[in-house]
Regions:
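Short, small-residue-biased leader/transition segments that mark boundaries at the very start
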Residues: 1-6
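Active-site metal-coordination/substrate-binding segment of hydrolases
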Residues: 73-138
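Hydrophobic/aromatic beta-strand patches that form the interior of the parallel beta-sheet core
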Residues: 76-78, 140, 165-167, 326-328
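Metal-dependent amide/peptide-bond hydrolase catalytic core
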Residues: 7, 15, 178, 185-366
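Buried hydrophobic packing segments
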Residues: 44, 118-128, 156, 209-212, ...
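Short glycine/proline-enriched coil/turn segments at helix->beta-strand junctions
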Residues: 49-54, 58-60, 72-73, 128-134, ...
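N-terminal helical capping/dimerization or prosegment-like subdomains
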Residues: 7-87, 250-254, 268-271, 345-349, ...
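Acidic/histidine-rich catalytic neighborhood of metal-dependent amide-processing enzymes
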Residues: 114-185, 189, 366
Length: 366
């Protein structure tokens, strides 16, 4: 239990930790599956307003601007998400009962992904709002992140003042992810002609996809990212046929494509279409790979603090941001979407201290 001095400013970390932990326990107890986050948003909005801050709301997204907001200064966004996935099978505890053990482990659905980030960033925001910085702050607790929903951060960003940099809270063990893989899902269809399997009839649609599936398995895009590695393509679903004795006239398969920052999703799609004969449709081009330069002053500060920049294979709301961002938060990615999800209270304490050290006195480029 200690006070922490950053650039001659004393921060009461124990009080901030106590507040953060209390809010997290309350959030765990409120089910907030993607697209059903209303009660969690209500709670968080009420909590922020009780701290004397005005809030904005659109759907189940809650945000708050620092006092004395000055459009001549750059603006820093602190963002994490309040929605969770459904509880997977295998939970031995009630996912919606926050259970804290003597070793400081706090169990609950969304504790790690991304409740700990939501509450750590909120306490840091409230503290920094009481100080003078060279930037404005916006705190945003967004919804629908786990489903990349249209009602999440994407619909809020146009309502906010221009943002110049973002910290996105996701479990990274407080290491800074300076690049993140994007996602594009393709639905691919081949058409044939139905016929009876016993006779030499029809045109088998399954045979038509074989070459294309082999191409997806074997093709390597030329540009490899030093942080994210190559573009990864995986055929993950296939569907054809109605019964054993009918030649299928249609075969569809799904391709999961994880992009690196060397290509836009549109560029990948254009290249793919040159090589395959089946009809391909992209579900969306919007979940792009993201990348921030290692020379960015915030990244440089993180490195000076002993943090190690890395490339993240998992998708977050960073994909929907048009400005530079850093993904960094308490907890471990490997605990997300697992039974008996947990966070250590000590990880929240560490996160609050590291966020303050990173952001108090920071410079953000316009």
């Amino acid at each position: 239990q200690r006070q922490m001095c950053i650039r001659d400013r004393a921060y009461d970390i124990p009080t901030m930790l106590s507040e953060a932990t209390g809010v997290l326990k309350s959030l765990i107890a409120i089910p907030s599956l993607s697209r059903d986050e209303e009660k969690a948003a209500d709670y968080l909005q009420n909590y922020i307003e009780l701290q004397g801050m005005a809030t904005g709301r659109k759907g189940n997204n809650i945000w708050c601007l620092s006092p004395m907001f000055d459009l001549n200064k750059p603006t820093l966004l602190l963002n994490s998400h309040i929605d969770t996935v459904k509880a997977v099978n295998g939970w031995r505890k009630d996912p919606f009962t926050p259970t804290q053990e003597s070793n400081g482990k706090l169990y609950g659905l969304g504790s790690n992904d991304a409740g700990a980030s939501v509450v750590s960033l909120l306490q840091v925001f409230l503290q920094l709002c009481r100080t003078t910085q060279k930037y404005n702050l916006i705190y945003l607790a967004s919804c629908e992140e786990e489903v990349s929903g249209k009602g999440g951060i994407e619909c809020v960003l146009p309502e906010l003042p221009p943002i110049h940099f973002a910290i996105v809270g996701e479990p990274t063990e407080m290491q800074p992810a300076i690049a993140e893989k994007g996602l594009m899902v393709l639905d691919v269809t081949a058409y044939g002609k139905a016929g009876h399997a016993a006779r030499n009839e029809g045109d088998n649609a399954i045979y038509k996809v074989l070459e294309d599936i082999a191409w997806f398995r074997d093709y390597r895009f030329e540009k490899v990212s030093p942080l994210l590695g190559p573009v990864k393509m995986s055929v993950t679903q296939i569907n054809a046929g109605t019964q054993h004795n009918v030649i299928p006239d249609r075969c569809t398969f799904v391709v999961d494509i994880r992009s690196n920052e060397c290509y836009s999703n549109q560029e990948l799609f254009t290249e793919i279409q040159k090589h395959i004969s089946c009809e391909a449709k992209a579900r969306s081009f919007r979940l792009s790979s993201s990348h921030v330069a290692e020379q960015h002053p915030i990244v440089q500060r993180a490195v000076a603090m002993g943090r190690v920049p890395f490339g993240s294979p998992t998708l977050s709301d960073q994909a929907l941001m048009s400005f530079p961002s850093l993904k960094m938060g308490p907890g471990k990615s490997s605990r997300s979407h697992t039974a008996d999800e947990f966070i250590f209270i000590q990880e929240i304490e560490e996160a609050i201290g590291l966020y303050l050290e990173l952001l108090d006195g920071a410079t953000i480029d316009i």
